[in-house]
Design a protein with these regions (language model features):
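Conserved phosphate-binding elements of NTP-dependent enzyme cores
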Residues: 1-826
């Protein structure tokens, strides 16, 4: 019997002809330093081939409607099952997505309400008992007055369909004109452009019509009477005969024109917006608020009327999942006897889906919570629950960093899911660095030994005890507990606030209670807490926008009472969202190295002989870019009925440059002249040696190396970088500056980081702090937590059981706090 997947000659990304057998029916961990080829093996080979072969079994007609993976660069993959992948960074959903729609729990709930609800009689107001007539698509009859009521279908309870509130179209939010933005500078006169929309939305004629309406346009706006201001903001749409003078053409004329007040000017422009560019011009005059008709529930009045167990659908969606599950359990017994079998079937489908989410620690979320406000870890667990709830067998699940966003106390739910999958006859391959999760693996494959070009080899494989004893393994000492991340110097407790403090006061929002937060300036503060305790809300939705508002002199977010941050002039959020969306953005361009290299090449004698300027060396717009691929390095072949195939450009071989560019060489420090294509093909460490004589290039490459990115090639496309790599590359431009007035906020920077890489990351934090910066990190990684100067622990639980600051102080103080769950793991 076949008991393993056989991989031979894998060459995806940096894999070096890898031959490896992956056990089936087991949990297989894939470890290794960042950039060593873990995701290339797990996602680029196993998932790509598993999903592609499954889709190949479908008809051509069906495949045409699906996103297909291209064939992996591998000699042979045998015995691979159909594969499902959970990616490291699930996409941030749109405004129409909620926790209920994303988990599909709302589908069951809508079905429940459409089949089992009570309806009020439209004539006498009496509530009509639930009846099987609804399932038979017959009307309900009022026993008192005989009136008939048509029950709503499940579709009519959907806010993305027929049940949507007419005012907000089912989004729960409306855009209204913000009057405070219409006249940004009231010292100006209307003639000088005081009314911003008339100036920017091309209604300059309104100044002349406004004058005809009786408003003085040569007096500063603040000195106008209330009546005049009201005409500017809300005046009636009257037609006026005006004489106008066009300053540009110096022509005069007369015409009849209808008055558009400042508010209507914006509303009219908004109604005509067709693209993002148009929206950008209008949005500065708008503010988002809760819909006045549906109160943010997204549902029309009809969908908010029927009741089940005494509550309406919008009220059910406002319960936490724990509360809602208890409520659903009591639904069948609250109904007439003949309806209970049908009710049990519907409720059972809800309970089954909810059970998995509860075991993954998401019981604190409400179904109406907007999916875009969820943390990455929460979105990933939603994705995981959806993938595993069907109890299928014989499937390969590839999990990319499933521990993202998971507090050590939440990891148990995740490991239970993995063991359940294997018990059902599936195989699990997980890419992770968390030793707590890797210890659950039956077999471990370690990639390495280094990153990028120096990685791509299998350096160790075996069971966990075998890896712990394997001298070649880099993760082994961490699994065995023999190695740890070296501590950075701690600040004495009495000096924590010596450089000042940042103070934030908020009122309640989501599940977070009113809070008072104090952070020390010039220190490393780590914000911890179980999943759902309110870390994202406190830092990303409160602290960051409050500091940005203070710096920009704009209004604080509605739920922020006050913020005190003396001498803070800039706030930088460094998150793991991908950099750029196309192949034209590379490491060299993002790190500002490419521009400097172009200038150096333009100064060479070869370039002068051919008359080349710096701009000619750009692979995006220069004359030396490859004409075949237009400087992208790849060409896309449109193959009918198959996914588009991207192949390296046959003319430039992927270098992005034409043959003429190869004739221009730059002398390098290691003695071998290099063309621009040669340099773009080097990794950062090699290029650093080659460009040792070029001061500015050397400095910028040195920063990348110190950030632990020495293995990236200069020509690597930025969208292909992992979350952790993207975060550190964003930091590159910030390093080396004086930063006493800066606050850096990191959202889980250890994503994708091996314990050895965490050591580098702590060095980066120390460098920022050495330059005077204040560093705030949302993190679950225990090594980072132990190395903090100051901890803020949210909790004690998730959702309603959390949302407050349980402990704040040094790691030692938090460890001794009995209420802190994080403290038990430090």
């Amino acid at each position: 019997m076949v008991d393993h997947i056989r991989i031979r000659g894998a060459r995806v990304h940096n894999l070096k002809n890898v031959n490896v057998d992956v056990p089936l029916g087991k949990i297989v961990g894939v470890a290794g330093v960042s950039g060593s080829g873990k995701s290339s093996l797990a996602l680029g080979v196993l998932y790509a081939e598993g999903s592609r072969r499954y889709l190949d079994a479908l008809s051509t007609y069906t495949r045409r409607r699906m996103t297909q993976a291209a064939k992996a660069s591998v000699d042979e993959v045998l015995y691979v099952p159909a594969a499902l992948a959970l990616h490291q960074r699930p996409a941030v959903p749109g405004i129409r997505s909620t926790f209920g729609t994303g988990t599909e729990l709302l589908n069951s709930l809508r079905l429940m309400f459409s089949r089992l609800s009570s309806y009020p009689c439209p004539q006498c107001g009496r509530w009509l008992e639930p009846s099987l007539a609804v399932a038979a698509e017959k009307p309900l009859l009022c026993p008192q007055c005989g009136a008939s009521v048509r029950a709503l279908s499940a579709e009519e309870f959907a806010f993305n369909s027929q049940g949507a509130c007419r005012t907000c179209s089912g989004t729960g939010m409306v855009m209204t004109v913000d009057e405070s933005t219409l006249v940004p500078d009231d010292s100006l006169t209307i003639d000088e452009g005081a009314v911003a929309p008339w100036k920017s939305l091309m209604w300059s004629l309104m100044v002349d019509i406004c004058r005809e309406m009786g408003v003085r346009t040569d007096v500063s706006f603040r000195d106008l009477t209330d009546r005049e201001k009201d005409i500017v903001f809300h005046g009636p749409a009257e037609k006026k005969h005006i004489f106008y003078h066009n300053k540009n053409s110096n022509q005069a004329g007369e015409l009849d024109f209808t008055y558009f007040n400042a508010t209507y000017t914006v509303e009219n422009a908004l109604s005509k917006v067709k693209d993002e560019k148009g929206m950008k011009r209008v949005e500065k005059f708008l503010r988002q608020g809760i819909c006045p008709d549906c109160g943010g529930t997204r549902l029309c009045n009809a969908a908010r009327t029927p009741k089940l167990r005494g509550i309406t659908l919008d009220k059910a969606c406002q319960m936490t999942l724990v509360q809602l599950t208890d409520w659903v359990a009591g639904v069948p017994d609250s109904l007439p006897e003949e309806m209970r079998p049908m009710a049990r079937n519907i409720c059972e489908s809800f309970q089954t889906a909810a059970a998995r989410l509860l075991s993954l620690g998401l019981g604190y979320l409400t179904l109406d919570r907007s999916a875009s406000t969820l943390s990455t870890g929460e979105r990933q667990r939603m994705q995981l629950a959806r993938a595993v709830r069907n109890r299928t067998t014989g499937v390969l699940y590839v999990l990319d960093e499933p521990s993202i966003g998971l507090h050590p106390s939440n990891i148990e739910g995740l490991t239970d899911v993995m063991h359940d999958l294997v018990a059902d006859g599936n195989s699990v391959v997980l890419v992770d660095h968390d030793t707590q999760i890797l210890k659950e693996a039956d077999w471990l494959i370690e990639m390495g030994p280094e990153a990028g070009a120096k990685g791509g080899h299998v350096i160790a494989q075996g069971s966990i005890p075998e890896i712990e004893q394997n001298a070649a393994s880099q993760i082994g000492p961490f699994l065995a507990g023999r190695a740890g991340v070296n501590a950075r110097p701690h600040v004495p407790e009495n000096e924590l606030f010596a450089q000042g403090r940042i103070h934030l006061a908020t009122s309640a929002i989501h599940t977070v209670k009113p809070l008072e937060l104090e952070l020390p300036k010039g220190r490393l503060t780590v914000v911890t807490g179980v999943s759902g305790s309110g870390k994202t809300t406190l830092i990303l939705e409160s602290l960051v926008p409050a500091l940005q508002a203070k710096v920009n002199g704009t209004a604080l977010p509605a739920h922020v009472k006050s913020v005190e941050a003396e001498e803070i002039a800039q706030v930088k959020l460094i998150d793991a969202t991908p950099i750029g969306i196309n192949v034209r953005s590379t490491v060299a361009t993002y790190a500002n190295v490419h521009d400097e290299l172009r200038k150096l090449f333009a100064k060479t004698q070869d370039a002068k002989d051919h008359g080349y300027k710096a701009g000619d060396f750009s692979y995006n717009t220069g004359k030396l870019r490859c004409p075949t691929c237009d400087g992208t390095g790849v060409i896309s072949l449109d193959v009918q009925f198959l996914p588009d195939v991207e192949v390296p450009c046959p003319d430039c071989g992927g270098s992005r440059y034409s043959r003429e560019a190869a004739a221009v060489k730059l002398p390098t420090a290691n003695g071998e002249p290099a063309s621009m294509a040669d340099l773009m093909d080097m990794d950062v460490s090699t290029a650093l040696e080659a460009c040792a004589d070029c001061k500015l290039v050397r400095q910028r490459l040195q920063v990348l190396k110190e950030l632990g990115l020495g293995y990236l090639t200069l020509g690597e496309e930025t969208p292909s970088l992992s979350g952790g790599e993207a975060q550190r590359l964003k930091l590159a431009s910030e390093m080396g500056k004086g930063q006493a007035d800066s606050v850096f906020v990191f959202d889980e920077p250890t994503i994708g980081l091996h314990p050895l890489d965490v050591q580098t990351l702590l060095g980066v934090f120390q460098k920022l702090i050495g330059n005077g910066a204040t560093v705030v990190v949302i993190e679950h990684d225990l090594d980072v937590i132990r190395n903090a100067d100051y901890l803020v622990d949210m909790g004690p639980g998730g959702g309603d059981a959390g949302g407050r600051i349980v402990a704040a102080g040094t790691p030692e103080q938090v460890r001794q706090n009995p209420e802190s769950i994080t403290g038990r793991y430090i």
